[in-house]
Amino acid sequence: MKLKRLGSIFLAAAMMTAALTGCGGGDSKSDGDSASSGGKSTVTLWATGSDNVRSIFEKLTEDFNTNSEYKDQYQVELQFMLSGTGAQGLADMVAAAGKAGQTNTDYDIVDWSGDDLAKIMSKIGEDSFVKLDKSKIPNAATVEAESTVAPEYAQPYRGTTVILAYDSEKVPNPPKTMDELVEWMKANPGRFAYNAPGTGGAGDSFARTSVYNFLPDEAITSGDEKWVGQWDEGFEFLKSIHPYMYKSGGSIVYPNKNQGTLDLLNQGEIDMCPNWADMVLSQRAQGAIKDTIKITQIDPSLSGSLQTLTIPTFGSNEEGAYAFMNYMLSEQAQQILVNDMAAIPLIDTSSMDMTGYEDLQGLDVSNFRILSIGDLGTQFNERWDNEIGSIG
């Protein structure tokens, strides 16, 4: 039987038990466990992330359970793990269950970021997941975005990407390429900033793509140590643009966190910065930042990612998992994702209300650069700290 549900956030004791047993939190089910008290079949959804992700999943599962075409057949239960808690990660838990040969668990459907998807596939392989039958996901028919990892086993349902955020009153014609951006920096010294890598994904993306623009395409999704020796040209580029970065008190400053650069942009201290599209648009919709702040992509693009869903072979409700996967690609669910987190929709938006989020329609998810360099990221940040952040 399943352990009693403890809500969307695990208690520390439960997490410790999972870590000690090495089998994660996906308990084996008896035949009666897949049916809820209302006679509907239970589907357990596993996800991880920050609190805003938890909030959106709570809203989506409630909508699925009460308003979707599947409301009389299935009941989704959310098991959510807050990131950064120091507890055993979701990928490690799912991997432990797979390696232990567990069957009929409550790992029915799992949500993954790009990095975590690569991690779980490296741990237990594609064979641990159901090869997706697209006839059971009819809403995926118009989705052009495809995962770069295990594309036959992972279904993308939303996108996010780092873009250039700019004040359209100050920059009526934003740069379209990296070369144009550099020329703009030189013509407008001190009006551009990116947050220090390691303090937020936008700064990570800008610094890493700036370096990896000088490397072969295969390098951006590789953790092979051989690429470290080819970082020199990219780091020289970062040094070359350093003098044109934002200054405070007469010294170059790399702000802390994604919000740090966005605050500077909103306060008029800078005119442009890299940031997450969803972060900028959601804050603009809430009135937290000026409505003159807009977004644009450059070529080569900054990095983005696709959020995906997979169905482990050792779950216990494959058909229910397909139902939820199909729901997530419905206009109904995609509208919630747009309204509540400014997620980039992956379906045709012509019938959706994009008021306030029109900028999302101009983002081409098919051209997203997924940058996943594994443990090299730590080395990268250390080198940036030593060679760029310390220049002053």
Q: What role is predicted for each listed range?
A:
Residues 302-371:
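Mature extracytoplasmic/periplasmic domains
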Residues 141, 160-162, 235-241, 289-310:
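Periplasmic-binding protein-like
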Residues 1-44, 392:
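Short, low-complexity disordered leader/linker segments with a strong preference
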Residues 38-118:
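Early extracytoplasmic/lumenal segment of secretory-pathway proteins
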Residues 50-55, 114-260:
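Extracytoplasmic ligand-binding site segments that recognize negatively charged/polar headgroups
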Residues 84-128, 137-151, 279-286:
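Pocket-flanking alpha-helical
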Residues 253-284:
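Oxyanion-binding "anion nests"
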Residues 263, 366-392:
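Conserved C-terminal helix/tail region of periplasmic/extracytoplasmic solute-binding proteins
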